[in-house]
Curated annotation (Swiss-Prot):
SMART domains: AAA (SM00382). The gene is ruvB. This is Holliday junction branch migration complex subunit RuvB. GO terms for cellular component: cytoplasm; Holliday junction resolvase complex. Its EC number is 3.6.4.-. Belongs to the RuvB family. It is found in: Cytoplasm. InterPro entries: AAA+_ATPase (IPR003593), AAA_lid_4 (IPR041445), DNA_helicase_Holl-junc_RuvB (IPR004605), P-loop_NTPase (IPR027417), RuvB-like_N (IPR008824), RuvB_C (IPR008823), WH-like_DNA-bd_sf (IPR036388), WH_DNA-bd_sf (IPR036390). The RuvA-RuvB-RuvC complex processes Holliday junction (HJ) DNA during genetic recombination and DNA repair, while the RuvA-RuvB complex plays an important role in the rescue of blocked DNA replication forks via replication fork reversal (RFR). RuvA specifically binds to HJ cruciform DNA, conferring on it an open structure. The RuvB hexamer acts as an ATP-dependent pump, pulling dsDNA into and through the RuvAB complex. RuvB forms 2 homohexamers on either side of HJ DNA bound by 1 or 2 RuvA tetramers; 4 subunits per hexamer contact DNA at a time. ATP binds at I22, R23, G64, K67, T68, T69, E130, D131, F132, R173, Y183, R220. Keywords: ATP-binding, Cytoplasm, DNA damage, DNA recombination, DNA repair, DNA-binding, Hydrolase, Nucleotide-binding.
């Protein structure tokens, strides 16, 4: 099993506690994702002008990009309360009914990991989203009867990292669909500078930029790296973070300039050394790395693919010339092209 990685995009308890203190409250403070911000500003203002609940919103994208944060910002901008839950927590239809019946008019209900809702719960959610009504079964056996309960108009915000796992009926009931993209190093630098200021960390712009460029395009990772570099600086540099201190801290953490850690490099080197650069099936690769298939597909691969170090083909995974060069190796003449180069397999 994979231990918690410093550059993992999944949230830890420390992340959740820290995020609460640095989470932006308004769209003006929500850095990056400019197209999403521009659209949501229009939808929010229009809903407020009409005095209506905003349409239901589906937010999807890799973990750590700010889906939960965006839901808080939306509720704050609408001036309503936010109720937060997740798909696995809502086990029965009654659990969902309890949440819905306690909402006030125009409130926002945020369901994280919405793709993990059970079919029974989804069936209750459909009329709630469309008609602001739910049907509840009272009693058992022949005496059971259905009672229709009216709900106040509300906005459902669903978040998922696996949009493809949503059922079509659920997906079609969202009037607003937003995809969050990986952040640029420049955007992450602004986020690191903002977080450092809020947390009272002495960090220079070049130190922030060094942290940002190793954060895999993900604010959650950038903020976590900032906290680890702060620890390093507190012991080794009197609490001051500059370029040199940030680089030394990253070397200690074994996070290279591309944002890769030992597991990323081990995966690339395994494909090169054991499978001649690929293609290799994901099951064989998982066995070689002693990792679960889901860990490879959901945790390790997305960033390697997005950065052009790895490609998926019908025959399996292949590394690109860029991966060979990163490992200090000379690419073979017949190695897979990097994403976007001539001969791209997609």
């Amino acid at each position: 099993m994979t231990e918690q990685r410093t550059i993992a995009s999944s949230a830890t308890r420390e992340d959740e506690a820290a995020d609460a203190s640095i989470r932006p409250k308004r769209l003006a403070d929500y850095l990056g994702q400019q197209p999403v911000r521009d659209q949501m500003e229009i939808y929010i203002q229009a809903a407020k002008a009409r005095g209506e609940a905003m349409d239901h919103v589906l937010i999807f994208g890799p973990p750590g990009l700010g889906k939960t944060t965006l839901s808080h910002v939306i509720a704050n901008e609408l001036g309503v309360s936010l109720r937060v839950t997740s798909g696995p927590v809502i086990e029965k239809a009654g659990d969902l009914a309890a949440l819905l019946t306690n909402l006030q008019p125009h409130d926002v209900l945020f369901i994280d990991e919405i793709h993990r809702l059970s079919p029974v719960v989804e069936e209750v959610l459909y009329p709630a989203m469309e008609d602001f009504q739910i049907d509840i079964m009272i009693g058992d056996g022949p005496a059971a009867r259905s009672i229709k309960i009216d709900l106040p108009p509300f906005t459902l915000i669903g978040a998922t990292t696996r949009a493809g796992l949503l059922t079509a009926p659920l997906r079609d009931r969202f009037g607003i669909v937003q995809r969050l993209e990986f952040y640029s190093p420049q955007e992450l630098t602004r986020i690191v500078i903002r977080s450092a200021a809020i947390l009272g960390i002495d960090c220079t712009p070049d130190g922030a930029a060094e942290i940002a460029r190793r954060a895999r395009g993900t604010p959650r990772i950038a903020n976590r790296l900032l906290r680890r570099v702060r620890d390093f600086a507190q012991v080794k540099a009197a609490g001051h973070i500059d370029l040199t201190v940030a680089q030394a801290a990253m070397q200690m953490l074994k996070v290279d300039p591309e944002g890769f850690d030992e597991l990323d490099r081990r995966m690339l080197r395994t494909i090169v050394d054991h499978f001649d650069g690929g293609p290799v099936g994901v099951e064989s690769l998982a066995a070689s790395l002693s990792e679960e298939r889901g860990t490879l597909e959901d945790v390790i691969e997305p960033y390697l693919i997005q950065q052009g170090f790895l490609i998926r083909t019908a025959r399996g995974r292949m590394v690109t010339p860029k991966a060979y060069l990163h490992l200090g190796l000379k690419p073979p003449r017949d190695s897979a092209p990097a994403i976007g180069e001539p001969g791209d397999l997609f």
